[in-house]
């Protein structure tokens, strides 16, 4: 059963400007250590911004699927990672809330925009 659906779109140059202006302060507020470490592997700030923009969109889409931040979750509690085949996944550090739920995530980018779509499903009726 679908419990929530969320989508978000992010303007990548906006993330680049925020990254250039706030640097570590921005990264540490929004992203997990693993997300930050992976983002540093990109050779250019533009590619790093694209990577971060997709994760930002995914976190926003997930919060929208939840119905907002009312569950006590902050952006840094949400981690986006890719499996060995490249499929994106979303985990929440406060997993006790989602033990009976599956979270489906799709990420995409084209030109200056990154987008994410999240579906939260429950096996319970």
UniProtKB/Swiss-Prot annotation:
Its EC number is 2.7.8.7. Its cofactor is Mg(2+). It holds the Pfam family ACPS. Its main location: cytoplasm. Mg(2+) binds at residues 8, 60. GO terms for molecular function: holo-[acyl-carrier-protein] synthase activity; magnesium ion binding. GO terms for biological process: fatty acid biosynthetic process. It catalyses: apo-[ACP] + CoA = holo-[ACP] + adenosine 3',5'-bisphosphate + H(+). Keywords: Cytoplasm, Fatty acid biosynthesis, Fatty acid metabolism, Lipid biosynthesis, Lipid metabolism, Magnesium, Metal-binding, Transferase. The keyword Metal-binding applies. GO terms for cellular component: cytoplasm. Belongs to the P-Pant transferase superfamily. AcpS family. Transfers the 4'-phosphopantetheine moiety from coenzyme A to a Ser of acyl-carrier-protein. This is Holo-[acyl-carrier-protein] synthase. It comes from Wolbachia sp. subsp. Brugia malayi (strain TRS). The lineage of its organism: Bacteria, Pseudomonadati, Pseudomonadota, Alphaproteobacteria, Rickettsiales. The gene is acpS.
């Amino acid at each position: 059963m679908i419990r929530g659906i969320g989508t978000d779109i992010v303007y990548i140059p906006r993330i680049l400007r925020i990254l250039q202006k706030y640097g570590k302060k921005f990264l540490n507020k929004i992203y997990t250590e693993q997300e930050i470490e992976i983002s540093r592997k990109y050779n250019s700030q533009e590619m790093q911004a694209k990577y971060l923009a997709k994760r930002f969109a995914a976190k926003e889409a997930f919060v929208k699927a939840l119905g907002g931040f009312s569950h006590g979750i902050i952006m840094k509690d949400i981690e986006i990672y890719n499996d060995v085949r490249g499929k994106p996944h979303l985990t929440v550090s406060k997993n006790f809330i989602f033990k009976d739920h599956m979270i489906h995530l799709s990420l995409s980018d084209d030109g200056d925009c990154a987008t994410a779509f999240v579906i939260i499903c429950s096996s319970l009726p």
